[in-house]
Amino acid sequence: MERTLQSVVGRRRGSSNRGRGKNSLISTPSYALHPPPRFRYPRWEFVRQTEYSMTACVRKGKLVLTYQYAIWKRVWTIETGFTDPSLFMTPAGTHTTEEIGHLDLFWLRYCSCPHEMPPWLDFLRGTLNLRISCRRALQASVLTSTPRHSLQRLAALQLCTNACLCWYPLGRINDTTPLWLNFSSGKEPTIQQLSGHP
């Protein structure tokens, strides 16, 4: 049976844009043309649509948290109302937040201790020490009750992980001070240290 396709070249399998004119309406999306840049994000933040990074800075004397999802341009900022951020730095370099808009509702809901409801402001100021078992229960309840990769889980987890740590004052903090501080050396930690690699 002779072939019905009468072209000199033979049957064209799907060649990518080569033999056709470049004026087709649907073009290859630009992100598919070039290989994605490597090491654009820290190695613990693989680019998924749901992953965010959090930084903190001081604006007009108040601590401002900034959340940015890895592949979106949009940045969320949450003003905490703190005037002295050194109170809210832990040795690990993480931040706790007192009033993050409506997120403190989640905080109030999930900080229930098995024995009693801890006064949450004391908890935040670091004057209240939860027992370790309570803190583990607290973390577990946060993980089961909040959606993954959400700001509310982030805030609640940070609040409950910072519970039993002691607070170190950092000295004077102004707009240029980096808030990821390594407490042993006083410098910013490397990405390896931040991501938990030795």
From Swiss-Prot:
Record keywords: Host cytoplasm, Virion
Any Pfam family hit: Lenti_VIF_2
Outcome (variant: residue 4 to P): In strain: Isolate R29-Nadin
Region (Disordered): 1-31
InterPro entries (alphabetical): Lenti_VIF_2
Biased composition (Basic residues): 10-21
Keyword rRNA-binding: no
tRNA processing keyword on record: no
Record localization: Host cytoplasm; Virion
GO annotations of cellular component type: host cell cytoplasm; virion component
Effect of residue 66 to I: In strain: Isolate R29-Nadin
Additional notes on this entry: The sequence shown is that of isolate R29-127.
Function: Determines virus infectivity.
Name listed for the protein in its UniProt record: Virion infectivity factor
Lineage of producing organism: Viruses, Riboviria, Pararnavirae, Artverviricota, Revtraviricetes
Gene transcribed to yield this protein: vif
